[in-house]
Amino acid sequence: MTHHYRELRGRTQAYIGALLGVNYQTVARWEKSKKCPDVGEVLGLAKYLKIPQELSNYMEDIARNEAQKNFQADRRFNALCLQFAEMYNGVICKWDPYLIPGIAQTRAYHFGVVPMTQNYTAAQLKRGWKFKLERSRALLARTDEPKVVLIISDVALRNLRFLSEPDRLAQLKRLQYLDSLPNWEIRIVATLYPEGATAFSIYRAGEAEHGGPDFVYTEVWDNSWCIEEDTRIKRYDDLWNILLGKSIALKEYLDDRRDGLAEEHP
């Protein structure tokens, strides 16, 4: 976030460091996730870089809880973190047993299928779609080609029956387009998978210059977590490998004409 808004405001690391009373190497360490600024420094960054209040609040919470490896917050708060992870991290892996991940959804899917999962107001749906668009466009605009792997349960594809045929076709074409990109891979799990394998994402810095620390994102009904604890990340890595082993390529799944999807949408 520091790097993003410093670049956006056209300021150097030395300039920001001088304002905050630290050297430019310290600012560089913040931007490379080697060190976390303290709360006072976050307040200074927010002021001088004109960081939006919501993001500033999130950064303050991170600074206050720097020692915690499992950062708990509501979905909206942690979604702001995911937005930046998708802009800067080098490896992005997502599993979802019920829905197509937001960065791969079409407008029709967002407004036609997502509302069936819970009651959303029109304003919430509108804001949610705007946020998904921002995230997907920022990710696809990256020139460093981060590795993106999506593993989706075939339940998510069978739920396309709730859309009209043109909208089903558009969503499948969206998935096929993303899968065709050299740095993207979409795979489908069409068999039983481990109990408790609810949706989660793994983000890694990889080769990205400004990628954040490795972490796992997961959520329950009223909260979500960004997990940096190595032993817990390892358990999610193990689960990811199980799911990967049970998955097949999107093209293979569609070519099998499972549930008529490939036949309806060549």
Annotate each predicted stretch with a short phrase.
Residues 3-19, 24-25, 29-159, 238, ...:
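Interdomain hinge/linker segments and adjacent boundary elements that couple functional modules
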